[in-house]
Each structure stands twice: as structure tokens, then as C-alpha cells.
Amino acid sequence: MKKFLILQMRPEDEAAKSEFEALMRVGGLERNEVHRIRLEKEPIPVIDIHEYSAIIAGGSPFDISIPEEKKSPVQKRIEDFFIELFDLIVPIDFPFFGACSGNGHLGKYCGTTISNTYAEPIGNVDVTISDAGKKDPLLKDLPQTFTAWVGHKEACDHTPPGAELLISSKPCPVQMFRIKKNIYATQFHPEADANEFILRINVYRHYGYFSPGEAGELIHAIKDSKAPVSKEILRRFVKRYRSKKF
């Protein structure tokens, strides 16, 4: 059986390790079912997508929307990598799931603007499945409105051209979209729980997501929060593409 390729973009080892474990745990993946690549590490290896059953891309502290001259060489290298990756997967509709930063890379590639217009503070938000989303295999029969974990400085301004909007929210209209039949992206974090976000609050307290002095208050506000429905989306993606051949 082919493995899932998990792409990560977090230079902070503690956050990267925790995210990787969360993706496996929520997705129901065993360690021998995945190939992990940390894209911020040099060099990025050559990837043959046909060696994998699907690709999952996680989050990142890098901001796609900042001016090019302010981007580090590492960030530029990652952005160039995703352009090359999408040049491969989009034409053949290869299974892909991008969460948060993965969402931004796919949205930009497909032609929408990424900006801070629909930034969301760290915490839970109510999201709503669209009429099109109700028919999607990853969302069918889920509650129409449910809670999801968010925390981002930028997002898609609009649904990318040619994409199907699957989930939206009042603070951020583009919470999940699909390209063709097998390429997905979410602005929210389906892998996350309160412990995961508490760790990220501590790791990223000086990264501009919130005032550093607010960390304790944020942790207190989210420590008992849960978002079980959003996890089902990642589980369904793994289940759907675990045995399919492309």
C-alpha cells in the first residue's frame, strides 16, 4: 500500500513534532503509513507524487501575503516548491489536503488573493457547510454548523476561480474549498485540539498572532474547548484515499 506524504513547514521543532503527531492521530494513520518531509529543512528532496496515495500539508508561521522582499530564503523556497507541486497534482486531480498554510498556498496558486482581510484570532469559530459541501464525501451527513479551531493572520479573500466553496463562516468566508474532485484545503485546523493550540500559543507568542501578554488569557479561554466534528473531515480524507490508486 502506498504511503501518505505529510508536508510540514514549521521551523520550530516542538510545534512541528506536535502537529505531525496530531495529523497521524486524528487521521488514524500509523507511522509506517506516512512519509514525513519538513520543507523548511534543506534541501527539499525531489518528490515523485505517484509513490504516494495522497498528500497532506500542514500549517506554518510564514505569511504568504507579505512583500517578496520581506520573505526569507526558506519561505521563498517553500513557496516555489508548492508552485511546482501544484503544477503536478492539479492537472491530474491528485489527492491533496492542505490545512491553514496549505490552504493559502493552494488558494494563491489557483488565483485568489491572500490577505489579512479575514484574519481570525486563536480559538474556536462556528463554520457552516454550503449546499455544495453537503454533497461532498468528506462532509456528507455532518452537522451543517459545527465548531472548528482557527488562528491565522491571513486567508483567501475569495473562493479561488474554478473551486467549489464547501465551508464558510461569518469572520472568514472561505473556510474550505475543493479543486476538481480530490484536491481540498481548509483554513481551520482539523487536526487540532486544546492541547495542540496551547502548545502553539506558547511557541508562537512573539509571532504576531496576538499580544504576548495575552497568552495566559488565551490559554484559559480555550483549555476546555472541543471541536470533534472537524476532526472527522481529516479522518474521512485518509479513509477515502488510503486504498485508492491514482
Cite the ranges covered by each PLM segment.
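Flexible gly/pro-rich beta->alpha loop and the following alpha-helix that scaffold active-site loops
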Residues: N32-F97
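Amide-donor transfer/coupling interface in amidating biosynthetic enzymes
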Residues: I6, E51, P91, S130-F246
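Glycine/Thr-rich phosphate-binding loops of Rossmann-like dinucleotide-binding domains
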Residues: E14, I64-I66, G107
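Cofactor-binding loop segments of dinucleotide-utilizing enzymes, especially the Rossmann-like FAD-
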Residues: M9, L39, S101
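Short, charged N-terminal beta->alpha structural module
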Residues: K3-L29
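Ligand/cofactor pocket segment of small-molecule handling proteins
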Residues: G104-H105, Y109-W149
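A phosphate-binding catalytic loop at a beta-strand-loop-alpha-helix junction
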Residues: F96-H105
